């Protein structure tokens, strides 16, 4: 399930560290978090959609690795992002 371009652009502008920033860990993690929440809602209605469940697990793993990278490189940015996204940590 792809994100709508308008929603993705809104997330990018909200979490970007500078103009045109699409690759910073904050932006990537925010986009992944939105995709994860959308897929989670989809799976609540379609419990037997195992292909989507596998894709969701891959996205969760990718977000976990990005969060680990951010925690290793800049703990302050990591804590701010966790707080902002409302992720448990």
UniProtKB/Swiss-Prot annotation:
GO (cellular component) term, any one: cytosolic small ribosomal subunit
Keywords, comma-separated and alphabetical: Ribonucleoprotein, Ribosomal protein, RNA-binding, rRNA-binding
Any one GO MF annotation of this record: rRNA binding
GO biological process per UniProt: translation
Superkingdom field: Bacteria
Transmembrane annotation, as ranges: none
InterPro entries named among the record's database cross-references: Ribosomal_uS15 (IPR000589), Ribosomal_uS15_bac-type (IPR005290), uS15_NS1_RNA-bd_sf (IPR009068)
Pfam families tied to this protein: Ribosomal_S15 (PF00312)
Residue ranges of coiled coil: none
Subunit structure: Part of the 30S ribosomal subunit. Forms a bridge to the 50S subunit in the 70S ribosome, contacting the 23S rRNA.
Similarity annotation: Belongs to the universal ribosomal protein uS15 family.
NCBIfam families: S15_bact
Function summary: One of the primary rRNA binding proteins, it binds directly to 16S rRNA where it helps nucleate assembly of the platform of the 30S subunit by binding and bridging several RNA helices of the 16S rRNA.
Protein name: Small ribosomal subunit protein uS15
Organism whose genome encodes this protein: Kocuria rhizophila (strain ATCC 9341 / DSM 348 / NBRC 103217 / DC2201)
């Amino acid at each position: 399930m792809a994100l709508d371009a308008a929603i993705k652009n809104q997330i990018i502008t909200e979490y970007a560290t500078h103009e045109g920033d699409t690759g910073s860990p904050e932006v990537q993690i925010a986009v992944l978090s939105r995709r994860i929440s959308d897929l989670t809602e989809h799976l609540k209605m379609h419990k037997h959609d195992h292909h989507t469940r596998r894709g969701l697990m891959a996205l969760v793993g990718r977000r976990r690795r990005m969060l680990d990278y951010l925690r290793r490189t800049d703990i302050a940015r990591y804590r701010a992002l966790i707080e902002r996204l409302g992720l448990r940590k």
